[in-house]
């Protein structure tokens, strides 16, 4: 899979921009605050219909403009597909092959991307919500049903929390509707729990040899999925539903008292252990970065296994955060395999040696020029 071209209209600091890309490595060089990250963000948004930098689509629209459009042409092994996203005060519209999609879950997955940025180092040591979002966004690209279920779960959870708040404030005493919402939450949430466990099992298998290689076989990586629903890793869907329902039943009084759902996928945690220790607490910064890098590289292979296509890799100012050894592992792993977009102030000697025939763009105050045109 590759992104052949990108067009931005009134997106961030770009009024009108069209770029054609190499199927290999594309590099955007420039100082900070020139628009490099905006370019990678636009590719991420084109793929996932949301930004990793802001929760408000209004931030994506250029200052004093009323609407913005991102469009691109995606090449797969057997087809080419035009994609576009249009943002306005009426919301966003997603199109595939020029046809508007009724649901974003029908759109996401047309272009698969993996982003590796300095903040992704927080994947290991950041808040649990960072890791839950990581699972949902990465697995959601591979599995449309999972993406749909997470959307449904959030809707039910919001409604259930609102009703718990009403019970807390004694605006109602009727718990029959709470039973209905609990049943819906269990039905959808149990599917999410099983899917997450299966995804993390596969991710662990893919990441372990990569992690061992980067650490020169000195360290062993283990992924631990710690759910607020205490189900066995090999449990059936019906068994998970039963355990989930029992957990909600036991927590009912506490939930009404606090006006919030205390059990479910939204409370789950992912932990990374290295040599049996939680790397977020006991690991060095080097071990934490090795873990994050191994997970990101494992995603590439796992996405290819699950979808039949390699994803597009976005490296946003991350090379400078890695030492020479980790830079080498990263660049060798993607060589001649994955279309890659890199932003950096400059390229290190290592990067220039390992990146074959990159297409280099220079970015200055939102103006982009090809290196061989300068």
UniProtKB/Swiss-Prot annotation:
The keyword DNA repair applies. It comes from Leuconostoc mesenteroides subsp. mesenteroides (strain ATCC 8293 / DSM 20343 / BCRC 11652 / CCM 1803 / JCM 6124 / NCDO 523 / NBRC 100496 / NCIMB 8023 / NCTC 12954 / NRRL B-1118 / 37Y). GO terms for biological process: DNA replication; DNA synthesis involved in DNA repair; double-strand break repair; SOS response. The RecF protein is involved in DNA metabolism; it is required for DNA replication and normal SOS inducibility. RecF binds preferentially to single-stranded, linear DNA. It also seems to bind ATP. Keywords: ATP-binding, Cytoplasm, DNA damage, DNA repair, DNA replication, DNA-binding, Nucleotide-binding, SOS response. One of its GO terms (molecular function) is single-stranded DNA binding. It comes from the Bacteria. NCBIfam families: recf (TIGR00611). It is found in: Cytoplasm. This is DNA replication and repair protein RecF. It holds the Pfam family SMC_N. Its main location: cytoplasm. Belongs to the RecF family.
């Amino acid at each position: 899979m590759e992104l052949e071209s990108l067009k931005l209209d009134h997106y961030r600091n770009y009024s009108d921009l069209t770029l054609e890309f190499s199927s290999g490595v594309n590099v955007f060089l420039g100082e900070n605050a020139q628009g490099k990250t905006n370019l990678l963000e636009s590719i991420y948004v084109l793929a996932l219909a949301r930004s990793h930098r802001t929760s408000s689509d209004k931030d994506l629209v250029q200052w004093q403009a009323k609407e913005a459009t991102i469009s691109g042409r995606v090449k797969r092994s057997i087809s080419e597909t035009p994609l576009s996203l249009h943002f306005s005060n009426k919301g966003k519209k997603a199109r595939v092959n020029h046809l508007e999609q009724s649901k974003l879950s029908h759109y996401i997955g047309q272009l698969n991307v993996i982003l590796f940025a300095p903040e992704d180092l927080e994947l290991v040591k950041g808040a649990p919500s960072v890791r839950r979002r990581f699972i949902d966004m990465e697995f959601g690209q591979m599995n449309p049903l999972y993406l749909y279920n997470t959307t449904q779960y959030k809707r039910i959870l919001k409604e259930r929390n609102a009703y718990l708040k009403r019970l807390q404030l004694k605006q109602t005493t009727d718990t029959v509707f709470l039973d209905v919402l609990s049943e819906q939450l269990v039905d959808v949430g149990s599917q999410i729990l099983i899917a997450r466990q299966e995804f993390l099992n596969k991710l662990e298998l893919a990441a372990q040899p990569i992690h061992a290689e980067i650490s020169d076989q000195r360290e062993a990586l283990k992924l631990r999925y710690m759910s607020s629903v205490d189900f066995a890793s090999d449990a059936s869907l019906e068994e998970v539903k039963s355990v989930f329902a029992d957990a909600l039943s036991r927590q009912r009084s506490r939930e009404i008292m606090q006006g919030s759902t205390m059990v479910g996928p939204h409370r789950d945690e992912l932990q990374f252990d290295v040599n049996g220790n939680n790397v977020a607490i006991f690991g060095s910064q080097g071990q934490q970065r090795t873990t994050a890098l191994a997970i990101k590289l494992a995603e590439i292979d796992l996405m290819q296994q699950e979808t039949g296509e390699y994803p597009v890799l976005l490296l946003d100012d991350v090379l400078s955060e890695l030492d020479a050894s980790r830079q080498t592992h990263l660049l060798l792993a993607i060589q001649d395999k994955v279309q890659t977009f890199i932003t950096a102030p400059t390229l290190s000697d290592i990067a220039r040696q390992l990146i074959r025939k990159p297409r280099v763009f220079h970015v200055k105050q939102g103006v982009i020029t090809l290196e061989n045109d300068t």
